[in-house]
Amino acid sequence: VNKVPDADKGNLQDRVDALTPAQVPDVTDANGNGKADTAEQAEARVFYEKAFSNVYQTGDLYAKTDTTSMFAPAATKLAKSTAQWTTILEKNAGAQMSQDQNAGGETRYIYNGSSGSDVITVGESFGGTGLNMAAARNDMKVMTGDGDDIIITGRDYGRLASSGQWDYKYLTEMGDGNDTLIVGASNSNLNVILFNDGSIGAVNKDNSQFGDVIPFDSAYDTSYGGQISGTTIDMGSGNDTVLALGYESGGTAIINATIKLGAGNDTIQIYGDVKGGSSPSVITGDAGMDTLIITNGSVFSEHFSGFEKIELGSKGEVKIVAKDLVGNDSNVIEGGVLKITGNSDSKVDLDGEWIKGETWNEGDITYTSYTHESAPGISVLIDDKITQII
């Protein structure tokens, strides 16, 4: 450049100044993971549409020892006892069935997932929630392994608590990865929508404008159901999502169940009540920034731990006892702050003597802080739009 004559340098600068800069579109990364939201949404749509539009097992999904093949080779007997899983095994290349015994000495059948992303889709129920005590189905363990796995049922998941089946069976372990569990896809009052960052959530059908609707196949449109009951679910590490969509008429969505979300920034969305059985239902957020969303139902603090945010939808209610917020190990509230958002028909019941403190502004939300001597170092911040605080 220094060798260019001075007279030409001026002309060169004029030409550079006249250039029109290239227009580069803004790239948004709402969750800060280094990937553009548009790319995440496109990948998520392909992933979810595959599961939403294909029901691999149209009836119930279960295993039952085949008594007609008692003297057949072990492989034949196993195949007949797990015949309901045939299509799912075909669709998840590399997945296999095996068997062992549970703690009670009963035969238990095991789904061993593929090395990739498993897709298990069921038109009706997984397990035996629709059965009475006289109907025999074997215990099961579902291990999807690592990968971004998804399980969807049109109806229920687990065992029928109302028939006295209080012992936990049908253990589910989804392994490492960003996994998804949807129970109650047949709830015709709701749409599942895809947000810009690739995450999903459920909304009432008149609110579907807040995201892109991903429709369920009509094979999920089965009879009454939508409850998680009598089972243990471990979502594993990763940013996991659980949608417990409940019954169309409302009522209990989770009863007598343990749901462990694992390390990661997880979300569980519940339509209906959370109740205990012979022991409280337990939903743990574990390490990470975790969110519990409840609509048209209530949850008590004895049923959850390790959550940093609670979103109360329409007619959503949470009752908090201070000592329940003091977690152990991975179930502490990260940062010692629990934020609760909602609206005028949401309700927060603070049990005991809470001290009302300062207000905090975060975006368009104004919070009021509450503390209790039984939960030292923990602040509960409640959205001022929630007017029912008792």
Locate each region found by the language model.
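Beta-rich interaction/scaffold domains
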Residues: V1-G59, A72-A74
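Extracellular beta-strand repeat scaffolds in secreted/surface proteins
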Residues: V46, Q57, T65, S69, ...
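Low-complexity acidic/polar repeat-biased segments
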Residues: S346-I390
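Glycine-centered beta-turn/loop sites at beta-strand termini
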Residues: N112-G113, V122, T144, T153, ...
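Solenoid scaffold repeats with emphasis on beta-solenoid/beta-helix
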Residues: T86-T87, R108-Y109, D118-I120, M140, ...
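N-terminal segments that cap or nucleate solenoid repeat domains
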Residues: Q57-K64, S69-P73, K77-I151, K205-Y224, ...
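Short linear proline/tyrosine/threonine-rich motifs used for host-factor recruitment
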Residues: T28, A36-T38, Q99, Y109, ...
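Conserved consensus positions within extracellular tandem repeat modules
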Residues: G104, G116, S125, A136-N138, ...
